[in-house]
């Protein structure tokens, strides 16, 4: 709303707010460059990869979302309910997407994935944030399976149960969320000790202390939870505080 930019989703998406639902191979022009939509279902049914075509018409990079990571691919077990498919069927669909849309692209294309090491969206992601597609073709286990059956078996093997908040994430992605400005307006106010006591006792607020462990150890509010900002803050909070509507008082 601030910039006037329109939101673009991949084919089959059904958001509850205004957005462009792109078609497979649809091209969007941004100045002198183009973005081509490659529908790559498997992680979810609307999952898409966005191919960057530069001013000279050269295919330069892909923004691969949750389809292709560095060292891994998107887990195919999260959209079973919405897609009315088994995880094996979704994994097979992901294999077909990779083989038909990603593997034929040139080796010098740069891969920009949506997640990196530490994310629960994959099991074998590298810490690097960018790589060539050619190197991924050589080193990514998921791109080196001899057939669909082997791919499905290897991709599903060893997947940990998804964090419990993932289901709510899906609903928020579809339904929309309050603007960041609105969140900051209501959530960035200093609280007095009386305010905190009122929120904890009457609103059921949880106290989340974001300081490092050493500072927390020196003194803390009883019954508070310490998850330091350094490290995997977001995944730990998501794992330990399952209800995304849980009122939280931050100690920083």
Residue ranges and their predicted role:
Residues 1, 39, 43-47, 115, ...:
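Histidine-centered active-site/metal-ligand motif
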Residues 1-39, 53, 58-60, 243:
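Active-site HxH/HxHxD metal-binding segment of metal-dependent hydrolases
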Residues 7, 19-21, 62, 111, ...:
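Conserved beta-strand scaffold positions in the cores of enzyme catalytic domains, especially
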Residues 8-11, 114, 251:
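Generic beta-sheet signal
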Residues 17-20, 72-73, 234-241:
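Short, charged, surface-exposed secondary-structure boundary motifs
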Residues 36, 46-48, 206:
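Short beta-strand micro-motifs in enzyme catalytic cores
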Residues 44-162:
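Metallo-beta-lactamase
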Residues 91, 104-106, 120-252:
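Cytosolic catalytic domains that perform sulfur/thiol-centered chemistry
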């Amino acid at each position: 709303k601030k910039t006037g930019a329109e939101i673009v989703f991949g084919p089959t998406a059904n958001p509850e707010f205004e957005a462009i639902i792109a078609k497979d191979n649809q091209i969007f022009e941004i100045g002198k460059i183009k973005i081509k939509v490659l529908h790559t279902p498997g992680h979810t049914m609307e999952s898409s990869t966005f191919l960057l075509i530069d001013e000279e018409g050269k295919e330069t990079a892909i923004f691969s979302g949750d389809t292709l990571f560095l060292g891994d691919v998107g887990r195919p077990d999260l959209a079973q309910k919405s897609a009315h498919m088994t995880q094996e069927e979704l994994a097979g669909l992901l294999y077909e997407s990779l083989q038909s849309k990603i593997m034929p692209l040139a080796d010098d294309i740069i891969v920009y994935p949506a997640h990196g090491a530490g994310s629960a969206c994959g099991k074998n992601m590298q810490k690097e944030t960018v790589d060539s597609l050619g190197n991924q073709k050589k080193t990514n286990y998921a791109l080196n399976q001899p057939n669909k059956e082997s791919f499905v078996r290897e991709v599903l093997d060893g997947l940990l149960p998804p964090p419990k908040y993932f289901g709510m994430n899906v609903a928020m992605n579809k339904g929309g969320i309050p603007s960041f400005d609105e969140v900051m307006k209501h959530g960035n106010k200093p609280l007095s000790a009386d305010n905190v006591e009122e929120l904890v006792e009457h609103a059921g607020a949880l106290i989340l202390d974001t300081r490092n462990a050493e500072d927390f150890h020196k003194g803390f509010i009883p019954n508070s939870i310490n998850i330091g900002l350094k490290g995997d803050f977001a995944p730990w909070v998501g794992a330990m505080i399952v209800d995304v509507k849980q009122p939280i008082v931050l100690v920083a």
